[in-house]
Amino acid sequence: MAEQVLIAVGDMCGPPRKNPGAEATAALARRILKAYPDAMILALGDNAYNRGKQDEYREHYTPTWGQPDLLGRTWCCPGNHDYRTAAATPYFEYFGEQRAGTPQRSYYSLPLAAAGWHLLSLNSEIDQDAHSPQLQWLRQDLAGRRFQPILAIWHRPRWGSGAHRDSKKPRWFLNELYAARGELVLNGHAHHYERFAPQRPDQIPDPQGFRQFVVGTGGRKLTGRTKDTPNSEYARFDKFGVLKLTLRPDAYKWEFIDVDDRVLDTGEQPVNQRGR
């Protein structure tokens, strides 16, 4: 059966003292790519600490996640640290328009044709309310995708059980994705791994809702649990690693793999049938 493998993670590279895991997670991604040469990497923001400057990308991202075999398979979304440099210009210059968008339109979509899915890369660091250009674009992009499974990435998670505060901003994204029967939401920002049960934008459990993953485990120093969040099914606060997703037209499988190649969390679920 046709499938698409994805390797997703955020919050990777920077000075080694505060980013001790980037080299190991990049090596892990390389091992997965060796087994799955057509896999895609999804970089979930805050790729080069602390300000997303040009020299930080050059000195910290390039030697690890920015090597040609990984960079050539990477698509991304920007994080809050990227915008600590004016307009996140180094981020857009480093990844290029095809894989990052532009400062003027920093969101994009592309088909995952092998699996029949649709990928959205959104920007949680700019306006996203009902009248914003980004949300208007999102509505247009989602129109007519009733029969296509949808995966969306952006940096700040709506919910999480770690040290970073929940963000209300993505509620606009979630409302549109739920209405379009979106399947998966992938975020970084919080420096831990967490998987949520399918739910609605108002946090009500719904077997036909979207499933959120937080994967801020790319290398930045990890943070611990600070609260218990409704619908959280599994979380790890002590392991660097990546989320490997295997997408098929009728289902998806997830595996959180740590840098020692151990699968710490795994499962499989049929795609959403609500309204199809």
Regions found by a protein language model. Give the residues of each.
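Extended active-site neighborhood of metal-dependent phosphoesterases/phosphodiesterases
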Residues: 27-30, 49-150, 164-184, 191-244, ...
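Secondary-structure transition/turn motif
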Residues: 13, 122-126, 214, 255-262
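Structural motif
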Residues: 6-8, 42, 119-121, 151-153, ...
